[in-house]
Amino acid sequence: SGIDGFTLGEKMQQSAERFGAVTELAEVYKVRLSGKIKTLDTSEGVFQGRTVVIATGASPRPLGVPGEEALTGKGVHYCAACDGAPYRGKTVAVVGGGNSAAADALALSRIAKKVYLIHRRDSLRATKVYHEPLMSAPNVEFCWNSTVSALLHDNRLTGLRLKDVNTGAEHDLACDGLFISVGRAPATELFQGELALDKSCYIMADESTRTSLPGVFAAGDVRTKALRQVVTAVSDGAVAVHYAEEYLAENR
């Protein structure tokens, strides 16, 4: 049987604590990272250290349609790679027009009976490499110039109401699952002005997880990277700890 993300995180935390890690629950209000000693101002006081590993993550951007939150996990999803398998032989929809939406639609087309790709414009923003495979997939249908105006449901998703952005006309579309891929928002507000961020506000860090400041490392979805999944985040955590230990050994 599978395991949900929350339970997996709990088990990882418990494992770390068995080896001596200390968990402090606090909200961080301000960070000062440029000095040799890094300082975090929090709801539970001030924490200081010579290294900091940032793993604040990133959240999928919601559509903002009524009922979206309640239906999350009940037909509404944000990750085709994570949640697509149960939709084998079923009808699904993907919302978005960028690379992640195109990749999700292409992946789902290999298992789903039908895939609707819904985009508010009349062409994809995704790179050309996705265009031909999607256009030639017999079970992929494009819904151009369309937005999702309502989620149809009976305790779980049963379909969508689509709105034509040009005419305002609406029609209903039956589907078993909806995959929302309209971007992600990294939790980096605290680090603006402290660390180098890319144009999408992800922390700029290479495969060593080093950031623009010595002694500061970024792991998981919050950093610049090609693939954001649990397995790559866990890998980042191990890498960040390795280089943090190395930094401490070299800067006693």
Please place each PLM-identified region on the residue numbering.
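Generic hydrophobic/aromatic pocket-lining and core-packing "Φ" positions
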Residues: 105-106
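N-terminal Rossmann-fold NAD(P) dinucleotide-binding loop
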Residues: 101-102
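Residues that mark the start of a beta-strand
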Residues: 90-91
